[in-house]
Design a protein with these regions (language model features):
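Membrane-interfacial terminal anchoring regions of lipid-handling membrane enzymes
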Residues: 1-137
Length: 137
């Protein structure tokens, strides 16, 4: 889990409701503290295969430095996303999302919007994982 998920969803609604809204310096401090001390759920560390061959391919493909950097970033992202551990999400995940929405205290709280944004946050890793394993860069 992302301990800052509810803070991110809160910020999304505040920006949606008021495009002029800006975070206060205290908001960043709260996010950092929450990120460091908050519950992260299950964490899996994996070592991915060596990418030296892919780096050689990139060097042969283009000599333009910015293009090389972007291609290297793409390879690294693909390796990370392909190695994701995707956990089953059932009723307890729905309960978790509802508990995160309950933590958001803002005027005109739009629970449907917040719920959608929280689910999107947690679905991106699944989408990225599926894309990475199908690409096989």
């Amino acid at each position: 889990y992302d301990p800052c998920d509810y803070l991110k969803a809160r910020e999304m609604q505040l920006k949606r409701d008021n495009p002029q809204w800006r975070k206060r310096p205290l908001d960043d401090m709260i996010s950092m503290k929450t990120g460091i001390t908050g519950q992260k759920g299950r964490v899996v560390y994996r070592i991915t295969p060596c990418i030296n061959d892919k780096l050689d391919d990139i060097a042969a493909k283009t000599s333009i430095r910015n293009e090389q950097i972007q291609l290297v970033c793409n390879v690294i992202d693909q390796q990370i996303h392909a190695a994701y551990e995707i956990f089953n999400r059932g009723k307890e995940f729905d309960d978790y999302i509802e508990s995160r929405i309950a933590m958001i205290n803002i005027p005109n709280k739009d629970e449907a919007f917040l719920r959608e944004k929280l689910y999107e946050m947690y679905n991106y890793p699944v989408i990225n994982h599926q894309k990475a394993i199908s690409q096989n860069i």
